[in-house]
Amino acid sequence: MKFLQKFIITVALLTNIVFAIDITENKVDRGSVTLSFGEIIIHPGASWSIIDNAFSNFIGKLDVKAKSALYISSTSHLLALQVSLTTLLHSINNSGIISFDSRVSLTPSSYDLRGLSFTNSGEMYFAASGRVPSTMSLTSASWTNTGLLSFYQNQRTSGAVCLGFPLGSITNSGKICLNNQVYQQTTQIKGSGCFSANGDSTIYIANVLLSVSANQNFHLVDKDSSMIVQAISTTQTFNVYGFGNGNKIGLTLPLIGIILESAHSYDSSTGILTLRNFLLEQRFNIGLGYDSSKFSVVTDSGSGIPSTIWGSVTYTGRVPTRALPKSCQMACKPIPEAPGVKPTDYTTTITKTNTAGNTVTETGAVTISTDKSGSWFTTTSIFPTLTTATSTSITTTLSNEAHIKTTDNTLAKVSSTVDYISAPISSSEFISLESFVDETLSNENPISTSTDYASENSFAISESTFITASDFQATESLVTESYFSKSQSSDSESFVINTSSAVDNSYVSSSSSAGGSSFPEETHMLQTSDSDLSSTAGSESDVTEFSDVSLATASDSSIADKSIGTESLYSEISLVSASESTGSIGELSISGDTLLKTASETKFVKSSFSSDLISETSSELFVSSSVSTDMILETANDSFITSDKVVETPSYSNELAFETVSETIINSFVSSESSLNTASNSLIASKPSTDSSSYTTDIDFETTTKSFAESPSYFSETVSEIASKSSLSMVEPSCWSELPFETSIESLIAPSYISSEPAPETASESFIVKPSYSEIASESITKSIISTIEASISSDIFSDATTGSIVVQPSVSSGISLEIPSESMLFSESSISKPFISSQSIHECTSDSILVVPSFFSSDVSFETVEYSSTVSTSVDAEPSYSSEISLKTPSESFIVSETFLEPSYSGEVVLATPSESVVASETDVNKPSYSNEAVLQTPSESYILSETGVKESSESSEFALSTPSTSFIASETFTVQSFASSEVSFGSDRESTISTEAIQVEPSISNDVVLETASESFISKAPTTSEFTILSETSIVEPSILSDLRFETTSQSTEMAPSATGVSYFSSTETPLASSSSYESSFATSSVSAIQSINSQVASASFVSADSTDSSEVGSSYTTASAFGPASSASEEKFISVWETSNSGGSFTLESSTSVASVVTTPLPFTSNDIITEISSTWNGAKSDSPHTSESDITSQYNSHSTSVATRSDSISLTDTFEIGFASTWTTGGSGNGGSMKSDVSNQDSYATMLPTSFLDTSNSDITTGVVSTWDAKNSNSYTSAELSTDPYSSDGYASSATAALSITESIPTTDTINTEYHSNGDITTSGGFKEISLTSHYEGGFTSESAGYTIASPSGSTQEFATATITSCFESKCSENVVTYISSVSHSTVTTGYEDTRFTGSIFSGDLASTGDNIVSASGRSVTDATNPFATNTDIGTTSTVSLYGDLNDSDSSVSGYPTNRSDSNGYANTPTTGSNTSGDFSQTIETGSSSFTAIPFENGSTNISNKYLKFLGTVVSILILLI
């Protein structure tokens, strides 16, 4: 029978190993998934999302590594999750994220996780709907939590949360969050963690006989939360926070006082609240500051707990201020959204070879969605990939004749021709298409005036490029006829009040149609001009406009070649148009006041895809005058535009996009004052001839412009007020929206300059005092019944909303994209969304939105700051609310782009302060709910700032303050990743680009989770470049072996970079940590180098920063001492040359050793005629490597000097003799004697002098000539080079060390990622010293015995890999079983690590130690310090995560490690410390990569705190039954 047991266990273990699942990349599975494969390991950076798998039964070990995730979710109302791990031989270990989410299910959920042990240092979420009672239990025998556990229900039911094996114990040092849940205590509670009751939650201490640690905390967060304690037990005191505002604390019996004591009492001096039932009482430490009169007795009748009448106490006042313990400060995060729970679609490319042997490329559109029953399905549509080009040519001839009636019958004629030529761009996915639109517009303007003049204007020619890019894919289709008609009429009246009057009535109407093409285009241009000419000279204005046009429609179409009349439900076109035109009006040969106003409007219509579009407006302004005149011009313009389109296919989406950027140059040299008031009302009606619903949109524009110009000798003031109002009407039943626009622009024009030339050309500089802004407010009410619609949208910036959407760009350059599906979403940066509208559903929503965004400006000087604020709020049905507050402080002439990504229940605040001439790109990305982030940015002038602030999986909020210098590119990216401590980062800067950083890391409890703050280098470019700079910044973060607080400063020097042909530049900075609070830490300095790679791309449009970091222990850098010679006399000539370089010794870069060279050349003193012997001595100070001012050239903190003797010679007859005479100088620099401070690199170094010939001055009148040449080299101590350096023994803070030579490392130190990688080395297998069999007790009932053996593979390269086999023997009723587990060391490393002295233990040498990963250094006690890498215990009670070595023979008594007994008769202790890399004691330490260390204790039956015999009997019974069944 015993053999059978061993055989079964062996087979089970082998099956578990063979069928293990390793997840190394992101994976999504939908539907039924079998998890009965054995061990499941999810590696860092990977995630596994399982969706709608009803039963998930883990039969092996579950191990989720740091930075990895496991999601099991249900999206069905009828399918609830059943997740279990019932085996008693395996464990659960989570360092990442585990989420079980069944909140949408209407049936009960069950989460039953048992196992041998449970350890959580990451985040675990258990969520259910709460409509019916659900089961949530974690009942492992060994139970430890140092991370976050969240138990969530939508509403409270009678279900309870059970933690730990009944009557056992749990250790909670993290936080346990309850939301609408009841926790019922069934075990002892150890540790100093926190239980948080959120919403309608209750903490029920059901058995006070199972003690609760006095350091455990209970936090009542909301007014409906409560805490109940069993009354029949010994009296205990519970730490309760947040009591007040109506929540409750009670007992399981009614509160009844005795003769001298009331039912409840509060001690205001101690903060203790006592509740009594006769002689039974319990105490609660609620804190100070409560008013005894506000306590009252109530009944807690919540479900899932005993409802005791008058058994609880409530406090009606607010909660007094009280600091929360650290464990309660960890945030209770919302349930994370699992990848893949929402329908998605994407495209894929398939390449195959057909029967003819040709390669065919096909494109597949893959859609993953659910049907009406909730089942997932995948649809793939395959169609050929088309590679075509689109060429569009538009030629417009504009003829303008102005008949001017004058007293002398002089006729002025103005003509112009404008050509528009378009060019293809990138790879458009249309079929080859060419369309030509020819149009001739004629305009006759009769002008009557009393002034005699004659003028003729030459042709004005402008070119614009029409650029089109599209993401639409379609096959060739034939449209027989397309009819488009568009008429435009304009009535214009002008009234000029001046010395002469003129009335101008102009009527312009044009129409044209184009057919016979898939994409016919129609162009309408309207040009009106009013002029009153009286001038002898002229100035011109060049107006350049850039217009981006975007058209997007959605389509789900049938694809057929050469199909006639194909009906499309949706179509998708992305059209981007950019045009640049320059209008110029030449000098007039007449005198007077001239005002010429030109307006043109172009409309492009794409016919076959039913889309509205779009307007391009260009304007030209010409002002010229030579006399002082006041002119008032008032113009009223009313226009009505109607457009009818005949479209064969219905259109379900419309997009209206406007984007205009204009630049105006005004040249004036006279004094004039004019006032221009223009009012324009436009009504545009578009009526597509389809059966689909139309839409109605009202858009109001209001613009006010004020301009001021001043010249040295004249004064000119122009006041223009333009008010325009236009409406775009598209009729839709029961749906309307209004979008008012309001724009205000004020500009100041600087003094002009007058030239004496006959045709003066003047130039003016524009100073923008206040930027313009745009406001859009929308209020929409939509009631509609819509059938099922699927739309795929691709756009730069657009919004999808049930009620309409509002996206506002600046008034000078703006784009609007509108689309109305049924769900509201916000996308940007070419996002793809798939809104779904259920059939025959009724949606009602109301939305009010206001968005204010500043405009684009350009300036040469800075001005005062103007504040803007904006608020965006949207509410759709029962969806979570989105809120974002942005406050911008921006002066004029700045380019500000703000992008906000919103997800449910997020909040973000950003405050920006930017001077003039700056480009600020701010992106706030909140990835997870319930997080807050505040950022303050202040930037001097002429700076480009890219700031990205995000909170990803963070447990705490962060505050950042950043200021950057002028003319610099600063990139800063800060994330707080799974940290248990708050972080504060402050960046300060001046014009020297000095960045100081202060970081405090309190609890670096998890080595795999790095909290990194990186300050990148400053970038300065004086010349414009077209390169994309990828800045790779590596910064060393110091983590000594005993880490308490870490503070360091960073100093960065801006470097000016000219355009380089190679495009590669390097910048360096140094970082110097401040003194640490730990006595075992030494001050040190690190240096970092940033490399900038140049790529052919626009600098401003695409740049990103990638920051990497490495952990390092005490890091030293080399610095070079410099020499200086004192002046001999005022007549002496001296030249001092000191050159030095610092290089990073932390291994961040693979650089050659830097050589610090300093040379001093001294010219001799001029002597007249005498025999003299001259001796010159130089004295200098050395530099300590831990100097806090390492970035400066100061040489400080080295108080030793050296003297250089100068050899002299007799009279020199010729210059040749000078070369034959040399000298050698020798110096020695000793230690500074400052305790544990790092010493200078030049220590006990006998340097050498290189004798070089030195040219001398004319010595014809001197009897002696002296030449001094002193040159020496100091080698760098970087261990990655073959540096030769010796150091002196020294003592620092009680830490003894001997002289050590720096090593030459032939391989790089393994990084954190390398540690997590398993290496398989080939080599000889040698058995190590072996493990000593440890038999703690005889094979009695409930006893365990463990024995182990180990061996090592030594590869030819010198690395080792260790194996260990552990055999665990368990006995029950004299029947024993064995469990054999084999472990393999996961790191292959070079054995170059040296140990250090550790005086924490004195004991004998343990001969059974496993071969260490480093050299065995005998300590003072004679004990071998062994860094074992064999965690062969199967039961884990983590005692510490620090580096621990196990000392002492296990047969000794009273030995312990980190407070855990190792030599007790009832436990078995193991400790391990995997250590890799290289380390040298002494001055120059290498980087040490230390893996996680653990202490293991297996408890046995020998005391009330261990596993009871009853449980072991039950365990044995279950095993016996399983054996019998097998």
From Swiss-Prot:
Subcellular location(s) of the protein: Secreted, Cell wall; Membrane
Signal peptide start and end residues: 1-20
Residues of the propeptide: 1503-1526
Membrane topology: Lipid-anchor; GPI-anchor
BP GO terms, sorted: cell-substrate adhesion
Region (Disordered): 512-541, 1180-1207, 1455-1483
One GO cellular component term noted in the UniProt record for this chain: fungal-type cell wall
Post-translational modification: The GPI-anchor is attached to the protein in the endoplasmic reticulum and serves to target the protein to the cell surface. There, the glucosamine-inositol phospholipid moiety is cleaved off and the GPI-$modified mannoprotein is covalently attached via its lipidless GPI glycan remnant to the 1,6-beta-glucan of the outer cell wall layer.
Keywords: Cell wall, Glycoprotein, GPI-anchor, Lipoprotein, Membrane, Secreted, Signal, Virulence
Major place of residence: secreted
Biased composition (Polar residues): 525-541, 1193-1207
Lipidation (GPI-anchor amidated asparagine): N1502
InterPro entries per UniProt: Hyphal-reg_cell_wall_N
The keyword NAD appears for this protein: no
Glycosylated residues in this chain: N93, N498, N637, N1451, N1463, N1479, N1502, N1506
Induction line: Repressed by HAP43 and in absence of GOA1.
Statement: the UniProt record of this protein carries the keyword DNA repair: no
Phenotype seen when the gene is deleted: Leads to decreased adherence of germ tubes to plastic and epithelial cells, but not endothelial cells.
Family statement: Belongs to the HYR1/IFF family.
Cited function: GPI-anchored cell wall protein involved in cell wall organization, hyphal growth, as well as in host-fungal interaction and virulence. Plays a role in adherence to plastic and to host epithelial cells. Promotes the tissue fungal burden during murine vaginal candidiasis. Also increases susceptibility to neutrophil-mediated killing. Furthermore, contributes to the severity of hematogenously disseminated candidiasis in normal mice, but not in neutropenic mice.
Name under which the protein is recorded: Cell wall protein IFF4
Organism the protein comes from: Candida albicans (strain SC5314 / ATCC MYA-2876) (Yeast)
Phylogenetic placement of the source organism: Eukaryota, Fungi, Dikarya, Ascomycota, Saccharomycotina
Name of the gene: IFF4
